[in-house]
Amino acid sequence: MKIFIPQESKQTLGGGWTWIRTFTKFSKDWAVITHNQEEKHDLCLIAGATQTSRETIIREKENKIPIVLRIDNIPRNSRNRNTGTSRLYDFAQWADLVIYQSSWAKKFIEPFIRKTGLVILNGADETIFKPEGRKITSPNSPVYLYSQINRDETKQFHIAWYNYIFIQRQEPNAILWLVGNFSPEHLQYNFDFFQGENWKYWGAIDNPELLADIYRSADYFLYTYFNDACSQTLIEFYLCGGQPIYLSLTGGAVEIKEKFEMYGREYLTATRMCKEYKEALEGIIR
């Protein structure tokens, strides 16, 4: 099976890019992935509505190539030149199959696009994100983690910030590790900490191996995201053996937590995810 995955977005960080990289690696036994539309292919898999253009997908439709749309959340028009939701709607109408990242995403988005579909929960690369491996030593203990790929307000850093202040008062030797993108003002003014709190900023990291080292070295993850459809960061942290502290339990986090508690870390692996995708995609091209 040869699959064309459009990859036209200039952004190189985020869930869509991580998913493409993971899917490519774990589907290699049964699929060949191309990002070149000129190459002959059996199927078009849209990893996210903001990853490609209407023109690209119209061409697929004209060539009668089966189209599969993967949906996580409603794209923000404010971040996509006012075209995010209209692109999502059009792609859904043209798709032969829609795959939602979580049951929450299906419940939220299905009434808008009026297209039923499957639910396949995300999985992460279990060969990288695992309890075994290098750990980073810290003179402080316990280590709390807060990580956000982007500065979207729904990540709610302010909640982690507020709660960590109280954690620090109760645990003077604790430290907060911060990973990801933050405003220049946060970086300049010590993330608004004002009582000598212990913290370390690791920067925006696009190296999965280093991320795994950080995640497995942390004791707790302060999870604050509001209605994230299926947090890759949360899944990766679970696979590394850490313990999330849910300061917000909304969106797909409910399902991730339930699946982990019912089936263990194996359910959150890319192996399980790609097995389910294989079955779904084979049904489209038969």
What would you call each of these model-derived segments?
Residues 225-226:
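Aromatic "clamp/platform" in nucleotide-sugar-dependent glycosyltransferases that forms part
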Residues 92, 213-218:
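Short alpha-helical donor nucleotide-sugar binding micro-motif in glycosyltransferases
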Residues 135-155, 161-168, 177:
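Conserved donor-binding/catalytic core segment of Leloir-type glycosyltransferases
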Residues 1-48:
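N-terminal pre-catalytic "stem/leader" segment of glycosyltransferase-like enzymes
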Residues 188-205:
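Nucleotide-activated donor-binding/catalytic signature segment of Leloir-type glycosyltransferases, i.e.
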Residues 44-45, 58-77, 99:
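Active-site proximal beta-strand in glycosyltransferases
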Residues 104, 123:
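Carbohydrate-associated surface elements
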Residues 79-80, 124-140:
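Acidic anion/phosphate-binding donor-loop and adjacent secondary structure
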